[in-house]
């Protein structure tokens, strides 16, 4: 078996990726989230496939087909809530994974990081289109508001929106194409994740100290496979607790009302994992300015390697940068909270201040603090 593992063309790839891979000996639990994302993706594809067997991508019957899945299909309710809450777990793991990369300077692996940012955009697009499919009130109005943002693009905006809609409003054509894209994108994400891993294993992983670990490597299996299984069990416990006890905790009650183009919900908002970006969008009174800020709030990750001014890679030995990083996390949580609040005082002002500080911390404060720390260490 050992010989087959090392000689068979396919087994050899799996062996070099998950078994005999030389890994740093000091990985912390923060390095578990990459494998957790892989498990989340597989779970989403499997549950999504079963949902697609019973779902109808038509404005007349989409809402009814989701109700039918929950009521009449064997364990349909469980598959549906595993898929909906699985997306939340996916984004929790994704945000922690990105946060780990920022904290420990993993963004200095340029190819891996850039593919990761593309993966983030693709995942966000997939999740947005999936949210439209149940065809509830929030699905319909969320799709209308978010796609309508493209009309802010000068000259081609209106034509672009109507092209995406497939008509003059969000309707049957929009739902059908969103379902088609929502079905195909996870497989594209899978391919991108393979490229992400390919680039990562080209140079070897970073580690908590941020220094070269070639002198102290251990095989991935059994050490990190066991550690990853522990992570899987913890995540499944959290996911099943959500699914079996609080299935609607992260959803919107408005989505249990069938889509009605004539009735606007009092407060249109996306899923919780987009609220931070939605808050940044809303904090700018100008439509085009808001759309630019929304895009930049994610695209800013691409520029992190260029703004790395520290002589050390990670933040493990830089207390000032650590402090600023956790302020940024608190800021993002504030933005998430604001995104779910109505547009009225004092939330407008809090949102504007949090949006401003988000960009200030990443673009100016953190690079400046890194330079200051270099001075402290006489570098």
UniProtKB/Swiss-Prot annotation:
Binding site for heme b b566: 97, 196
Bilayer topology term: Multi-pass membrane protein
Binding positions for heme b b562 per the UniProt entry: 83, 182
Gene3D superfamilies linked: Cytochrome Bc1 Complex, Chain C
Protein name in the entry: Cytochrome b
Species classification: Eukaryota, Metazoa, Chordata, Craniata, Vertebrata
Main location: mitochondrion
Residue spans crossing the bilayer: 33-53, 77-98, 113-133, 178-198, 226-246, 288-308, 320-340, 347-367
Domain of life: Eukaryota
Gene Ontology terms, MF aspect: metal ion binding; ubiquinol-cytochrome-c reductase activity
Assigned keywords, A-Z: Electron transport, Heme, Iron, Membrane, Metal-binding, Mitochondrion, Mitochondrion inner membrane, Respiratory chain, Transmembrane, Transmembrane helix, Transport, Ubiquinone
Localization annotation: Mitochondrion inner membrane
Binding site for a ubiquinone: 201
